[in-house]
Amino acid sequence: MSSIYIGVYKALYDYAAQAEEELNIKQNDLLYLLEKSDIDDWWKVKKRVVATGEEIVDEPSGLVPSTYIEEAPVIKTATALYDYDKQTEEELSFNENDKFNVFDLNDPDWILVGDLAKEKFGFVPSNYIQLDSTAEPAQHQQQQPQQVFQPPPQQQQAIPQQQTQIPINNFPPPPTHKDRTPDFPAPPAHRDRSPEHPPPTPEKDYPRMFEQEPRSLGSRYDRQPEGREEEEDEAPPPMPSRPTGSNIVAPEPVVGRSNTYEQEENVEHSEHSYDGEFFTWYIDEVDGRKKRAIKLSIGQGLVIIKPNTTNPKKLRMRSSSSLDNQWRIKDLITFNNEKKHVFLEFKNPAASLELHAGSKDVAEAIMAILGDLKGAEAAHGLREVAKASKASANERNRKIGRLLYDFEVQGDDELDCKEGDEVYIIDQKKSKDWWMVENIATRRQGVVPSTYIEIISTSNLDKLTDGPLRRKSTKSKGRVVETKDKRSSHHRTREERDRIREKDRAQRDKAPTSQTEQDKSMPNFHRVRTWIDSSGTFKVEAEFLGCVEGKIHLHKTNGVKIAVAADKLSVEDLEYVERVTGTSLEQYKEQVMKQQAKRAKSKSKSGATATPSSTNETKYASSATAAINDIAPPKPTRPQTTTQVSNNGAPLYDWFDFFLECGVDIGNCQRYTLNFEREQMDENILEDISPSLLRTLGLREGDIIRVMKYLDAKFDRKKTPEAPQQNGGLFIDKNGNLKNNSSSTEISKVSADALPSPVKTQVTSFTPVNESTQNNNKIEDDAWAMKPAARSSEDLLKPSPQPQTPQYTGALSDLVNIKPVGTSNENKAKTEQIPVEPSAPALQPMKTSNTAATSSIPPQGPGVTPQRTGTLVPVQKTGGLVPVQRTGAGLVPVQTGGYLPAQPTGFVPITAQPTGFIPIQATGILQPQLTFGIVPLQTGTSTFNANNKTAPPRPDTAPPPITTFGQQPTFQPAFVPLQTGVITMPQTTFGGQSQQLPTQITGGAPPQTSFNQPALVPTQRTGGQITGGFVPQSNFGKQITGGFMDTNTLSFGQQITGNAQQQPPPSTSFGQQITGGLPATSFGQQITGGFPQTSFGQQMTGGAPQTSFGQHITGGNMPNTSFGQPFSQQATSNPFPQMANQFTQQQQYQQQQPVMNQFQQQPQQQQQPFYNQFQSQPNLNQMTNMFQNTSISSPATFNQQIPTTTFGQQPQFEGFGSQPLQSQPTGMGFGNAPLQSQPTGKRANLQAATPDNPFGF
């Protein structure tokens, strides 16, 4: 990219623009030629304008007559020092050693030049070129007459002014060129600052004239390379920023440059001062190839370096000058100079600085001041030598400490000291916190807190006497250091390291730069230090490279790089790494201190000279840190016993050694030691240590055995076997035999408190209960052992009519409230109370069912018999569905019976005896379903025969069922018989329960509806729905899930499964529909459906009950939803009595599919009477098995006993029965899986309930 300028010209005359496109110019203005016209003599130029300060100016451009301008004279030639690529179109790109003609030096940062071929013109950085002394200056002199011939008036005045200023030293020179050299080219404006606040470009404030003596310029540049020949190959300096310009016309800054050199020679006079406390110099810091102005102050034992600029852009360099830094004079490790350069190396913090003093005199002055202060600071060493020479023999090994803070006496044995007092350390082992010391000046002795003392030296001359040995050891790296005192050895190695550094520094300074740069494989000798291992045995001279993951990386003087574990180095080395990296290594320092303390103790035991522990050494360092804070640390508590405990609670007992002696792996000793010290344990508790204590403190089992063996041997203890537990464990008894946690006596899940008083009497009479109570009141080790639950009675299997009746009622209530088999006694009590209020109806139905059961099994209480019998058997025996239904009614109220859904009664059994329910439901359901199914429906009706519409035959049943059936007839005229059958069933159940149905209606109006629905073709519906009807019937289908849930009859609908679960609280089932719920559950698609819903699916069969009840029950009972799609809605909405209406409505609803039709959807089911259908479905038998209703298999029985049919369907229950309640499909319908476990043929007796027999069958 070529330059936009095609020439540099100078105005010969003034010209005033006469048009907008023309440009005003003055004589001697510098112009950049932009365009030449081939048509006329008007050329386009741009006027050069130099900005002043931060001013931003625009350089105007326009047309001027070509006769008013001429080419600008070349005032100097220059040579490129580095390659440069231009950044803007006004600049020039060039390569190293390119030659240029210089036209203007007015800008100290950017020089206006052109190539020798005069083809390219532009600006180049001033610190990238070097001006040459050539013939151009002579040419410049020849041009001067011309310049004087027509000078502008202001220039005439400026000439004498400049001449008078030539000898002035403070004339501001251009910043860049004076100090620019190939080695340290500095950004312009560096050298032109005044002693206090240098302006970046001071020469801009003065007009420059070409008339100035050119020789001075040449001499200034000619001298430059002399001092820095070795730096010619340096990399290029940073780019200067482009100037903003100034209106000053005169471009000649030559005079200022010559004066700059003179100023450099006098820099020590003009740029340093002394205010009585500090010597101050304004010099430069060199960081690589960059230099920054700094202010160096030395005095008061400090060396302070601060940046010397107010321009934030000057602080870009990341070096010591970018921030204030301060070191104590004693932290100055080495200092030397070479010509104008001063080299300093500090510690705390570590830093290596290179300063450019500007002149050799200034560098020597800085060296002299540093030498005086460093010597004065080291003078205390001479005083220590004098004191050591006077010390007596017994004081040879004493340490000398200095007080960091004032200490006031608070005890008789304490020593009053002031800050700065020096004392002998007499005894520092007796207590870590209080040291016995002797004041060197007063010879008084006493104890002083160890944190107030800083160890500074020793009272002997080991440093002098051990010198030859130390020098010998340094020549063999890694050889054992022969020394008696690790501390003195430590000091020796530090001094030796200092001398080695000084020697290496001198060699490095003398060596050529190129040689040093070539030796990249060797460490930086300026950073080499001596590293000593924690034992003081080995040492190595190496440079620190870094610390990573607990490894200290070092570069040895032989060029080998190594990584040393942090816990293997001395504490001082770790502190050095902490200072350099700013990373905490406390965890490693603690390990080193422990190891050193252990070694010191072992040496003292063996008779070796006791060496100071690393713990104390670290305390010195800690004290030094506290000294920086200038805050006295808290005074430790005075020891009261011979066992000294530090302020942090750590006992003096060496647990580490203890564990080693016990045979514990050394890798675990430290962790165990920390745990014991954290708990403030000392040797006094050794005899009390037990395995449980060790286990609590984190010891491993193997180590626990080792420690206990060691303690037993130490205290001559004989281990006695632990006495066996008196009460045995969780699975064993006192004799060690396996416990039989299952009791021969059935355990009641109902607490004695929840049972009626007669039962309570029985409960209290039981010894097992008392034992359990007594055990519960004991606080023994076997508190977690399995214990038998409180038993209500040993004779639970022996039912007594009176107790059983309330129990039965209570069971019903419990079933209503019980979700899982076991509920709290309180809930059961509440449950008992709740049903007791309506117990008249509930009990009577139950009694009725009991009566039915009684007819089958008189000895047992009416309620119990059906349950125990497995409802099916009793129901079947009853032959009359009525009894069964009544039983169901008893459980749920009659509706259940009437419906098998009515099996709410079954429901009760569900809780008490699900089996009872199932049979009841099965019977009721099957027949209705069978009847509905086809002819069987009628047959079923006959069976129910209550049958038939003759709801009248069974007045009791008629009312509730009538409603139900009423709806059913409406539902499907074809099913009139079925309805009758249904009616019959309900009648049977309802027989005595019609009233209960209302109750059920209340409890679960839906259930009644379901009854109605069952009465309706629900059975068939169920059948139809069983497959599609069931689900299809939105109610049912939905109910299966939702409807059911409403009814709480899980049985219904798909619910059977879902609802059953949902109804886990039988109470829910009952709750919503004690009657309805039950029926719904049992029957409503439930019996089968309830359990598996399959019955629904298969339904008729499995759900004969489901069938009839199935959809109906579900629909009517549960949610009506089931049945209804039709029934469910209406049935639910209407009470039982309304069932008829609902049924009618549902008829329409079911018109979607009359029950028959729905059944027809399942042709097989419709084709087959419910009975047949049930039979067709193997579930029927299964159901029978579930319910254990023999009658299930036989349709007649089925008819007679809805349970049978229900059972037929029960196969699905079986699915339900897969749960423990299988025997009680009804219970399953309700979702009380636990009931299944009870046999159908048995009576429920909650007092005799056990985990295996929750209903006490």
Swiss-Prot record:
Keywords, ordered alphabetically: Actin-binding, Cell membrane, Cytoplasm, Cytoskeleton, Endocytosis, Endosome, Membrane, Nucleus, Phosphoprotein, Repeat, SH3 domain
Alphabetical list of Gene3D superfamilies matching this protein: SH3 Domains (2.30.30.40), SLA1 homology domain 1 (2.30.30.700), Transcription Factor, Ets-1 (1.10.150.50)
InterPro entries the record matches: PH_SLA1, SAM/pointed_sf, SH3-like_dom_sf, SH3_domain, SHD1, Sla1_SH3_1, Sla1_SH3_3
Domain remarks: The N-terminal SH3 domains are important for actin cytoskeleton assembly but not for localization.
Main location: nucleus
Keyword Cytoplasm: yes
Example of a GO cellular component annotation carried by this entry: cell tip
Stretches with biased composition (Low complexity): 137-169, 605-615, 1136-1168
Organism (species): Candida albicans (strain SC5314 / ATCC MYA-2876)
Polar residues: bias regions: 846-858, 1057-1075, 1082-1111, 1117-1135
Protein name according to UniProt: Actin cytoskeleton-regulatory complex protein SLA1
A molecular function (GO) term: transcription coregulator binding
Basic and acidic residues bias (residue ranges): 189-227, 493-511
Membrane topology: Peripheral membrane protein
Subcellular location, record wording: Nucleus; Cell membrane; Endosome membrane; Cytoplasm, Cytoskeleton, Actin patch
Sequence segments annotated as region (Disordered): 133-252, 464-523, 596-621, 718-737, 789-867, 1057-1168, 1207-1257
One Pfam family linked to the record: SHD1
GO BP, sorted A to Z: actin cortical patch assembly; actin cytoskeleton organization; cellular response to xenobiotic stimulus; endocytosis; fungal-type cell wall biogenesis; hyphal growth; regulation of actin filament polymerization
Oligomeric form and interacting partners: Component of the PAN1 actin cytoskeleton-regulatory complex. Interacts with PAN1 and CLN3.
Keyword check for Cytoplasm: yes
Lineage: Eukaryota, Fungi, Dikarya, Ascomycota, Saccharomycotina
Entry comment on modification after translation: Phosphorylated by the CDC28-CLN3 complex and by PRK1. CDC28-CLN3 phosphorylation regulates cortical actin patch dynamics, as well as PRK1 phosphorylation and SLA1 association with PAN1. Rapidly dephosphorylated upon hyphal induction.
